[in-house]
From Swiss-Prot:
Record keywords, A-Z: Cell membrane, G-protein coupled receptor, Glycoprotein, Lipoprotein, Membrane, Palmitate, Receptor, Transducer, Transmembrane, Transmembrane helix
Source organism of this protein record: Mus musculus (Mouse)
Glycosylation site list: 17, 27
An annotated GO BP: UV-damage excision repair
SMART domains: 7TM_GPCR_Srsx
Functional summary from the UniProt entry: Receptor for MSH (alpha, beta and gamma) and ACTH. The activity of this receptor is mediated by G proteins which activate adenylate cyclase. Mediates melanogenesis, the production of eumelanin (black/brown) and phaeomelanin (red/yellow), via regulation of cAMP signaling in melanocytes.
Protein name per Swiss-Prot or TrEMBL: Melanocyte-stimulating hormone receptor
Length: 315
C-alpha cells in the first residue's frame, strides 16, 4: 500500500509487486495514455453502499423461512461473496486513509501482512462470486427446462453440498493464487475460469430466452393475440438478457483482460497504459457487487416484503 498513490491491491501482486517480478513496463509514460485516477472516497462510498445492500439481502433471506430454498441459498451466498468484497475494500481504503493522515502508525511488515490477508479475502470472494453467478444460472435453467423434476434435482442437501464445495474451492484457490502469483499459469487459469463462467451464463440465459419467446408465441397463437404482443415480450426479454450479461462482462471483463495482458504483452506500451488503470478495473468489480442485489435479489417480491418488515421493525 503506497501512500502516494494508494493501490486497491485486489491481489496487490498484480498491481505493484507483480509488475517488477513479471517485468511489466509500468514506468513508461506515453502522451496518449489514458489514466483514470480513482479517489479513495469513491471506493469507500461504493463499498459502503454494497455493504449495506448485501447485508440487507442476507438478513431478509435468513429471517423469512419461505426463502429457505436452494435458489435463495445461492442468492444469499452471492450476497455474502459480494459482502466480502465490500468489507475488504472498505477496510483497505480506511487503513490507507488513516496511514496517510498519520492517525495510524504501523510497521511495514505488519502492513504487508494485512495487505496479503485482504488480498486473499478479495480473491476468494471474487472466485465465489463468479461461481455463485454460474450456479444461479444453472438453477434457473433447471427450473425452466426441468420444471416437473426441479425439486427432485435441486434438493436442499445437494444445494448445501454445492455451497460448501464452492466456498472450499474459493479459499484454496485464493490462497494458491496469492502464493504463486508470479506464475503465468495461475493467471491463465483465472482468465480461463472467467471465460468459462461467461460462456456458461451466455449459453444458458440465451437458451432460456429462446424458450421464453417460443412459449410466448404459443400463448399468442392459442389466444389469437396480436403478433406485436409477442414481439414486445421478446424485446423485453432480449433487453433483460443484454443487461444481465452486459453488466457481468463490463464489470468483470476489464480485470481479467488485465490478467491476460500481463501474460501476453507485459512490456508493450499499450498494455502498460492499461495496467495503470488497475484501480478502475477493481472499482468495476465493486460496482458489480453493488448491482448484483438489484438484479438477483430485490426483484423478488417476497424478499422485498421481508426487507420492508425488517426495516419497519428496526425503526
Amino acid at each position: 500500500m503506497s501512500t502516494q498513490e494508494p493501490q486497491k491491491s485486489l491481489l496487490g501482486s498484480l498491481n505493484s509487486n507483480a509488475t517488477s517480478h513479471l517485468g511489466l513496463a509500468t514506468n513508461q509514460s506515453e502522451p496518449w495514455c489514458l489514466y483514470v485516477s480513482i479517489p479513495d472516497g469513491l471506493f469507500l462510498s461504493l463499498g459502503l453502499v454494497s455493504l449495506v445492500e448485501n447485508v440487507l439481502v442476507v438478513i431478509a433471506i435468513t429471517k423469512n423461512r419461505n426463502l429457505h430454498s436452494p435458489m435463495y441459498y445461492f442468492i444469499c451466498c452471492l450476497a455474502l461473496s459480494d459482502l466480502m468484497v465490500s468489507v475488504s475494500i472498505v477496510l483497505e481504503t480506511t487503513i490507507i486513509l488513516l496511514l496517510e493522515a498519520g492517525i495510524l502508525v504501523a510497521r511495514v511488515a505488519l502492513v504487508q501482512q494485512l495487505d496479503n490477508l485482504i488480498d486473499v479475502l478479495i480473491c476468494g470472494s471474487m472466485v465465489s462470486s463468479l461461481c455463485f453467478l454460474g450456479i444461479i444460472a444453472i438453477d434457473r435453467y433447471i427450473s425452466i427446462f426441468y420444471a416437473l423434476r426441479y425439486h427432485s434435482i435441486v434438493t436442499l442437501p445437494r444445494a448445501r453440498r454445492a455451497v460448501v464445495g464452492i466456498w472450499m474451492v474459493s479459499i484454496v484457490s485464493s490462497t494458491l493464487f496469492i502464493t504463486y502469483y508470479k506464475h503465468t499459469a495461475v493467471l491463465l487459469c483465472l482468465v480461463t475460469f472467467f471465460l468459462a463462467m461467461l460462456a456458461l451464463m451466455a449459453i444458458l440465459y440465451a437458451h432460456m430466452f429462446t424458450r421464453a419467446c417460443q412459449h410466448a408465441q404459443g400463448i399468442a397463437q392459442l389466444h389469437k393475440r396480436r403478433r406485436s404482443i409477442r414481439q414486445g415480450f421478446c424485446l423485453k426479454g432480449a433487453a433483460t438478457l443484454t443487461i444481465l450479461l452486459g453488466i457481468f462482462f463490463l464489470c468483470w471483463g476489464p480485470f481479467f483482460l488485465h490478467l491476460l495482458l500481463i501474460v501476453l504483452c507485459p512490456q508493450h506500451p499499450t498494455c502498460s497504459c492499461i495496467f495503470k488503470n488497475f484501480n478502475l478495473f477493481l472499482l468495476l468489480i465493486v460496482l458489480s457487487s453493488t448491482v448484483d442485489p438489484l438484479i438477483y435479489a430485490f426483484r423478488s417480491q417476497e424478499l422485498r416484503m421481508t426487507l420492508k418488515e425488517v426495516l419497519l421493525c428496526s425503526w
